Amino acid sequence: MTTKIYILNGPNLNRLGKREPQIYGHETLEMLKNRCLEKASSLGLEIDFRQTNFEGVLIESVHEATDLGVGGIIINPAGLTFTSVALMDALKMFEGPKVELHISNVHQREPVYHDSLVSAPVTAVMAGFGTDGYLLALEWIKGRAR
């Protein structure tokens, strides 16, 4: 049986490749998804790769992962990282490994990006690896997935 990992992407990540490429690079979300699918396959994992601009939809995806007992969650909450108590609470309910991921090093950016509400309930935090962080997170989570 293949372990399923949810990769959840928050607001504005559908604009990868267009939005601030000097920070986020030129790779589109579709290109990133394809790289993640390829990496997951090589690791013997199955992924469900999602993006939404809506807080409630992201929270419902975490609830779904919890209810289905998926192997792990990799989440880039984007701007919701710093504002969403509800997302933080949803992540507390998921008992498997959880990685908070950011493409840029949020700690080198403006102060508004320094205080994550999502970091407390997750297992690990990755930031500053560019989109390669997603591939590294898949490698890390493989050995810890339930």
In which residue ranges do the predicted regions lie?
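Glycine- and acidic-residue-enriched helix-capping/strand-helix junction motifs
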Residues: L16-E30
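Short beta->alpha junction loops
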Residues: D48-G56
